[in-house]
Every structure is written in structure tokens, then in C-alpha cells.
Amino acid sequence: MSEKKINLLDLDRKAMRALFADMGEKPFRADQLMKWLYHFGVSDFEEMTNINKVLRQKLAARCEIVAPEISSFQKSTDGTIKFAINVGQGQEVETVYIPEDDRATLCVSSQVGCALECTFCSTGQQGFNRNLTVSEIVGQIWRVSHFLGFAKDTGERPITNVVMMGMGEPLLNLANVIPAMDIMLDDFGFSLSKRRVTLSTSGVVPALDKLGDAIDVALAVSIHAPNDELRDILVPINKKYPLDEFLAGIRRYIAKSNANRGRVTVEYVMLDHINDSTDQAHELAKLMKDTPCKVNLIPFNPYPGSPYGRSSNSRIDRFSKVLMEYGFTVIVRKTRGDDIDAACGQLAGDIRDRTKRLAKKRMQENQISVTMN
């Protein structure tokens, strides 16, 4: 039986250099290869013309370059594109490209499904299957970059920002998310600014501390309720890591981070007559007063079977004005791609194994999988 080949898209620069050292090669050769992968999108060793033939042959014998394939895509009337990405075993995740006048953001998934079961989120209602590998995470960017033309002009704006806000809770997959983000930030990788890579979390506090020790990226935090009683219902992980613990973890992260410029983004989905009253706005403002942040109000995007409705514009406006009276910067997120179910909270994918009992068992046994090993 032949030895399984190493997928080079699984390796950040440190791991890539270690592989090349094992082959008796100098570190700069690893850097050259990464540029071919991430600057030019080359997947054929024979096209890497500044790498000598002997090394190309060694690489072909020992390594491979395999990214998950785009199985289908839908384009919204607003230019948003939702991609179904085939990650094997009959499973798909969803990746969303969001173009704007001055940027283009790619919303990337970190897991097949999600174990957190947030009650307003379509993905959370589908159950959890597995973590994505490094190559499956960076492969989403790699494939969409190919779709957009990499160095060629296809009329689509190239990716300038990446947000880890797709399917899954990124902090439950640190072992793969951290090296994937390293590749996003690396000058020999996708070469993105740390302020242009954002990780969103619902509050796995021990993993948030580990993230802050390992890498510096922009942070978005899913709060969605002004008190523990309501958040226990909307975001069940709150029962394990309540708001006071989460906010303390956020402040620790801010203290370590340059990418956040001293404050994080608070995400707050607007659910009609659930969490959107002016009293709750006052409560949220008092909750967040010691945590430097701007607030992103997200109109709820309904999905089939959802028990919630979207807050009216007038309720969102009143809620926003209360927060601004306390001095918060408030942004009401423009809904993008809702006509193709690509908006926030609508990603579900094709998850064949939706056994929630398995997810809950893993959460109990692994303390929600916060180790990086």
C-alpha cells in the first residue's frame, strides 16, 4: 500500500519549511512554492518554473495539491455569490462571496454543520458532522479565487477580506483554523492584513484565550441577548460560558490584539419582540459599557421552520438610537444574498450525518473541544 501523499494546502509556512527541510531543501524553496500556490493558484508542479526539475519530481512523488471542489453556485441580484463546496463523503459546506464598492468579502465555513444549536440559526438546526481540515478551509478561498480569476481580470472584484462567519463555530476547530488563518495572513500565502481577517465566535471562552495567544485577527462576538436568561435560550453555549465570563474573555483578547484597534464588533441579531425592545437596548448598553466595541445589528433572515420573525425597521431604528445615546457606534447590517439563502444565519449545506446526540456527547467529553492538539 502506497504512503498517503501530503496535501500542501494543509501546511502553513512553518510546516511547509519543516517538510522541505526533511527533503534536504532550503527554507526559501518552501516560500517559492507557497507563492505559486497562493499568489498564482498553480496546482501543477511542472508549472513552477523557478523550482528545479529534481525537486519538482520529489514533490510530485511525495505531495499533492488538493482543494475541495465547487459543486454549484448561485448569484444574487445584488452580486452576492453562494458556493456549495464539496468536502467529500457526500458533504458540502457553503461559502459566500460578497462584493462591495471598495472591497470583496468571502464568508468561510470552519465545520460541516455546527454543534452550538443557536435557535435562530439555520446551520445550528442542522446538527454537527465534523471539523474541516486546513486545506478545506483555505481551499474555499483558493477555489473561489480561481472562480474569480486569481491574477486575471474576470470583472469580479478580487477577495480583500475573509470572515470566519460561515458554517460552524471556529473556536471549536482551533487546530485547523489557526494554521488556516496563518496562511491567510502570510506574505507568501493570501497576504491579507490582520484587520481584514475576522473570526466570529459565540463564546467558547477557553478557546478564545488560546486564540489570543496564537494569532492576532479581528474579532466579532455573537451576543444576541442583553442577559443570561434570554441568551441561554438563543445561544445555548451561554449555559456553559455565561455573559460575564464571555465579556471578560473578550476584554483579555482586546488587550492582546492590535488587529482590533482597541475594540471588537458585537453581533446582535434582531428578533421581532424577542430581543429588540428599547428596554433591552438599555440593558445591552449597560452590559457592554466596560467592553470597548461597536455594535452590528443584524436583521433576522427567516428560514423554513424558524420560530422567529424579523424585527421591523422601526423597532431596529429605536433600538439603534438607544445604543447611540450611550455613545456606541451602531451599524445596521445590510442584508445581502437573502434571495439565494446566503444571508447571515441561512447557511445550512448538505449535511448527511445530522446526529445531534453525537454533537452533545462530544461537547460533554471534550469540554467543547478547546484543545489545539
Swiss-Prot record:
Active site (record annotation): E94 (proton acceptor), C344 (s-methylcysteine intermediate)
Lineage top rank: taxon: Bacteria
Amino-acid positions noted as binding [4Fe-4S] cluster in the UniProt annotation, renumbered to this chain: C114, C118, C121
InterPro entries: Aldolase_TIM, Methyltransferase_A, RlmN_N, RNA_MTrfase_RlmN, rRNA_lsu_MTrfase_RlmN/Cfr, rSAM
EC number of this enzyme: 2.1.1.192
PROSITE patterns in alphabetical order: RADICAL_SAM
Co-factor binding details: Binds 1 [4Fe-4S] cluster. The cluster is coordinated with 3 cysteines and an exchangeable S-adenosyl-L-methionine.
Catalytic activity: adenosine(2503) in 23S rRNA + 2 reduced [2Fe-2S]-[ferredoxin] + 2 S-adenosyl-L-methionine = 2-methyladenosine(2503) in 23S rRNA + 5'-deoxyadenosine + L-methionine + 2 oxidized [2Fe-2S]-[ferredoxin] + S-adenosyl-L-homocysteine; adenosine(37) in tRNA + 2 reduced [2Fe-2S]-[ferredoxin] + 2 S-adenosyl-L-methionine = 2-methyladenosine(37) in tRNA + 5'-deoxyadenosine + L-methionine + 2 oxidized [2Fe-2S]-[ferredoxin] + S-adenosyl-L-homocysteine
Subcellular location, record wording: Cytoplasm
Main subcellular localisation: cytoplasm
Stored Gene3D superfamilies: 1.10.150.530, Aldolase class I
CDD domains with a match to the protein in the record: Radical_SAM
Co-factor requirement: [4Fe-4S] cluster
Transcription is among the record's keywords: no
Intrachain S-S bonds: C107-C344
Molecular function terms from GO: 4 iron, 4 sulfur cluster binding; metal ion binding; rRNA (adenine(2503)-C2-)-methyltransferase activity; rRNA binding; tRNA (adenine(37)-C2)-methyltransferase activity; tRNA binding
Any one biological process term the GO annotation gives: rRNA base methylation
Keyword list, A-Z: 4Fe-4S, Cytoplasm, Disulfide bond, Iron, Iron-sulfur, Metal-binding, Methyltransferase, rRNA processing, S-adenosyl-L-methionine, Transferase, tRNA processing
Function: Specifically methylates position 2 of adenine 2503 in 23S rRNA and position 2 of adenine 37 in tRNAs. m2A2503 modification seems to play a crucial role in the proofreading step occurring at the peptidyl transferase center and thus would serve to optimize ribosomal fidelity.
Recorded family membership: Belongs to the radical SAM superfamily. RlmN family.
Other comments on record: Reaction proceeds by a ping-pong mechanism involving intermediate methylation of a conserved cysteine residue.
Protein name: Dual-specificity RNA methyltransferase RlmN
